[in-house]
Regions:
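Short, flexible segments with low predicted structural confidence
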Residues: 24-25, 57-58, 136-141, 211-213
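Residue-level detector of alpha-helix boundary/anchor positions
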Residues: 2-4, 152
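Internal/C-terminal transmembrane anchor helices
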Residues: 130-151
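A short, ordered amphipathic alpha-helix with a cationic face
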Residues: 73-75, 141, 194-195
Length: 243
């Protein structure tokens, strides 16, 4: 179909569509790749680290994958804290912290796969059996947890302290520093705020965002709710199951 001036509308639309499709395909691939990264760092690495510690250090071989995941998060946070404190006080770069943290956790996970491969297979089989034999009440609870997680993940929620904590994470990523820039003013801090130095969760958000190649704000408002809400329920379930 042509306009009065001879412009071919149909052919032009085809050309536009052909130009857009590669871009859309690339974006879908990037989203899929980032989802895999999130699964690795939010689930795979904690599980493998916790499994290695429980089986080889604590010699507890009768516990399920949930115990390994929770233990792994304790270990990940401990490793992160021990790495962050000296680097922060030494005014090291965020990139160095990311490299060291990823190296320690990655190496530990690889060792876990090598030494605990039989236990991993057992956990896969026992997990399948557990979910297969779970009651209706259990699946209703899972559905409610998914709904709660989905609301906070998909819809917008505003936290008053985001002006500092998320801004601190974003500033760390953008300036490649560890709590050296005031997120309110953008000026270099003359002294460390010890309250936040001793509890560097905004720095963890920045490191995690680097590892999964996402903006810290998206990590804080979309990724972390999807991770930590189910994790909190998992901790509660493991505690209650002991009684």
């Amino acid at each position: 179909m042509r306009r009065d001036d001879g412009y071919d509308i149909l052919n032009n639309n085809k050309l536009v569509a052909n130009d857009i499709m590669p871009v859309v395909t690339l974006e879908v691939r990037m989203i899929f790749f980032k989802v895999i990264l999130i699964a690795i760092w939010a689930l795979g690495v904690p599980y493998l680290m916790g499994l290695l510690f429980r089986e080889k250090c604590l010699k507890k071989d009768n516990l399920n994958a949930g115990h390994a995941i929770v233990t792994g998060y304790f270990l990940m946070f401990a490793v992160f804290y021990l790495l962050t404190m000296p680097l922060l006080l030494a005014s090291a770069s965020l990139s160095l912290l990311v490299i060291l943290f990823a190296s320690v956790c990655g190496l530990t996970s690889i060792i876990s796969v090598i030494l605990c491969r039989r236990r991993i297979k057992n956990h896969m089989r026992s997990g399948f059996t557990f979910f297969k034999n779970s009651s209706v009440i259990f699946w209703i609870a899972i559905l409610i947890i998914i709904l709660q997680t989905g609301v906070l993940t998909v819809y917008q929620h505003i936290d008053d302290d985001d002006a500092f904590f998320v801004a601190t994470s974003t500033t760390a990523v953008e300036t490649n520093t560890i709590v050296e820039i005031d997120p309110y003013t953008g000026e270099v801090l003359t002294a460390h705020r010890m309250r936040y130095v001793m509890s560097p969760f905004p720095v963890y958000t920045a490191v995690f965002s680097r590892l999964v190649m996402m903006h810290p704000t998206i990590v804080a408002h979309t990724v972390f709710p999807a991770v930590f809400i189910p994790l909190a329920f998992l901790v509660a379930y493991l505690l209650i199951s002991n009684f």
